Amino acid sequence: MNKTSVPSPDSIDRQWFLVDAENQTLGRLATEVASVLRGKTKPNFTPHLDTGDFVIVVNAEKIKVTGKKSDQKLYRRHSGRPGGMKVETFKALQSRIPERIVEKAIKGMLPHTRLGRQLFTKLKVYKGSDHPHSAQEPKILSLNSESVTK
C-alpha cells in the first residue's frame, strides 16, 4: 500500500508569474490567478498547505468586464460607523483605484481562512506595466492557453 506524500514547507518550489491584465475579462483572469496562487496547477497540491506560486498582475486599469457591468456593478465598503456605507460603481473605482478591483475579485476566490489570507499576500497587483519584482525573473503566464513561457 502506498502512502500519501505531504510536501514539507522547505521542499515547495515557488515560482514567480507575470500576468498582463490588458483586455482580459475580470472573472476569467481571477480564476486562473487564484488557481496558481492556491497551487492547484502543481502535482504536489495539498488542500491544507500553501503550495502556490507568486503572481504579479500588471495593467490593472485596463481590465474589462462584459455587458453593462462597468455601469451597474457596485463595490461596497463600510467604515464601521453608523451610516458609514460607501457605494461605488466599477467605472468610478477603476478610475480611482484599479488595483482594488482585481484584488477583490481574486481574494473572493481564495479560501476564507488563515490559509487564504496567507495566499493573498503572494498576489502583487500594479497599475501600469511597471513592477518592482524584475529581480525575481517572473515567467509570463498566458491565460488564453495553458502554456507558461519565459
Swiss-Prot record:
GO molecular function (one): mRNA binding
GO cellular component terms attached to this protein's record: cytosolic large ribosomal subunit
GO BP of this protein: negative regulation of translation; translation
UniProt key word Nucleotide-binding: no
Disulfide bonds: none
Renumbered residue ranges of the record's region Disordered: 128-150
Keyword Ribonucleoprotein part of the UniProt annotation: yes
Signal sequence extent: none
InterPro entries from the UniProt entry: Ribosomal_uL13, Ribosomal_uL13_bac-type, Ribosomal_uL13_CS, Ribosomal_uL13_sf
Keywords: Ribonucleoprotein, Ribosomal protein
CDD domains the record matches: Ribosomal_L13
Function: This protein is one of the early assembly proteins of the 50S ribosomal subunit, although it is not seen to bind rRNA by itself. It is important during the early stages of 50S assembly.
Cited NCBIfam families: rplM_bact (TIGR01066)
Oligomeric form and interacting partners: Part of the 50S ribosomal subunit.
The family this protein is said to belong to: Belongs to the universal ribosomal protein uL13 family.
Protein name (record): Large ribosomal subunit protein uL13
Species in which this protein is naturally found: Prochlorococcus marinus (strain NATL2A)
